[in-house]
């Protein structure tokens, strides 16, 4: 099975922009964790796209495909081609180890119409990069890589519709989507729409309104302001009172921003495995978030660090999945554990930073569990886990 892992930030999504070091590091951490998990599974061949400004990495099983036709040293062709209609084979490759394991063909739970999946019986193991340069069109390159794959695992922010566009492209090319369905992706792209959707279905949420309707919160402050389609803590700010918030809003404008009351509580997250409206709560995570000069800074967290709250968080995980049946595979839920009970902040229909330590925390391979969802029901996969807290450190590079 050839899997194209498309990590947006490190994989070419910012080719014509300066690469933010923090975002690139966070993307690389998630990418490396996922690739490590996939690489040990039998019959899996991995291809990545890579911004050529970044180092390739040190994994022993690299092969390299260069979009400018610069062949890697001693290139070797792939032994097998994908037998999916319209597929293409990368131009040059370099591999190391081999294996005789091959996957069994299986149907996709979420794919475009009209193409029968036949699988890829490859005996060559490798992890490949398609190097993208500033002169390249990342979306065209990704389309080619999607066509050359059997399945695609998107890791992209909701910001600007990037994840939704990538999801649509995968399905348009009739490939297996190893991620959430378009309806869930589009809903989660708006924090405001997500909160309203969950609240209408009885899920406890943090009160959220458009910035222009801050009076509806009926509180003098403090307030938290963030982009409606933002990812992580990017551009999330604290305002101590209404006057400061109003002055800032007058300068920046209210469009595209949401406001929430600041709630003193524990910033936690949930790592879920989802399918057809059901959820398996893999881990309850602690998040490290600090406020520096009235800006929220995400410093990482501890996967499995809030397992003591599992009994309280499992009903929330179930309720979120039931309210958003388009969640499939891995999904993250951010919440605040406040004195009156936990409240959901947002839903992430993609890998989150907690995935970096998730495998170590679970003592299991989360990528393997997710791939099993292609053929098996969630209830068949679920089993007891002995969870050990594992940290993810994201101290800012400029700290």
Regions found by a protein language model. Name each.
Residues 80-82, 112-114, 124-125:
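Glycine-biased, low-complexity coil/linker segments
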Residues 170-175, 181-265, 276-279, 302-315:
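Active-site nucleotide/adenylate-binding loops and adjacent lid/helix of ATP-dependent enzymes
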Residues 260-325, 337, 348-374, 393-395:
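ATP-dependent carboxylate/phosphate-activation module, predominantly the ATP-grasp catalytic core
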């Amino acid at each position: 099975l050839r899997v194209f892992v498309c990590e947006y930030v490190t994989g070419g999504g910012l080719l014509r922009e300066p690469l933010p070091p923090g975002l690139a590091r966070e993307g690389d951490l998630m990418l490396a964790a996922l690739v490590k998990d996939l690489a040990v599974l039998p019959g899996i061949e991995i291809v990545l796209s890579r911004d050529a400004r970044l180092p390739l990495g040190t994994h022993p099983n690299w092969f390299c495909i260069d979009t400018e036709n610069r062949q890697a040293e001693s290139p070797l062709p792939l032994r097998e081609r994908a037998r999916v209609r319209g597929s293409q084979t990368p131009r040059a490759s370099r591999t190391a180890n081999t294996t005789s394991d091959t996957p069994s063909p299986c149907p996709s739970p979420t794919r475009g119409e009209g193409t029968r999946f036949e699988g890829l019986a490859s005996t060559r193991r490798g992890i490949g990069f398609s190097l993208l340069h500033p002169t390249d069109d990342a979306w065209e390159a990704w389309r080619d890589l999607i066509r050359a794959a059997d399945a695609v695992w998107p890791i992209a922010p909701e910001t600007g519709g990037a994840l939704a566009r990538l999801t649509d492209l995968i399905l348009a090319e009739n490939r297996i989507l190893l991620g959430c369905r378009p309806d869930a992706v589009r809903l989660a792209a708006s924090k405001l729409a997500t909160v309203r959707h969950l609240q209408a279905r009885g899920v406890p949420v943090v009160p959220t309104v458009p910035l222009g309707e801050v009076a509806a919160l009926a509180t003098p402050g403090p307030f938290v302001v963030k982009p409606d389609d933002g990812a992580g803590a990017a551009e999330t700010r604290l305002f101590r009172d209404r006057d400061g918030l109003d002055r800032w809003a007058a300068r920046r404008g209210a469009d595209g921003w949401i406001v929430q009351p600041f709630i003193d509580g524990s910033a936690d997250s949930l790592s879920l495995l989802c399918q057809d409206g059901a959820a398996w709560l893999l881990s309850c995570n602690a998040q490290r978030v600090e406020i520096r000069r009235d800006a929220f800074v995400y410093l990482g967290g501890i996967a499995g660090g809030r397992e003591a709250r599992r009994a309280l968080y499992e009903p929330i995980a179930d309720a979120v999945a039931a309210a958003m049946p388009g969640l499939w595979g891995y999904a993250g839920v951010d919440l605040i554990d406040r004195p009156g009970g936990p409240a959901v902040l947002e839903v992430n229909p993609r890998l989150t930073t907690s995935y970096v330590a998730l495998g170590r925390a679970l003592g299991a391979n989360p990528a393997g569990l997710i791939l099993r969802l292609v053929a098996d029901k969630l209830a068949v996969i679920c089993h007891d886990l002995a969870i050990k807290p594992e940290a993810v450190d994201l101290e800012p590079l400029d700290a």
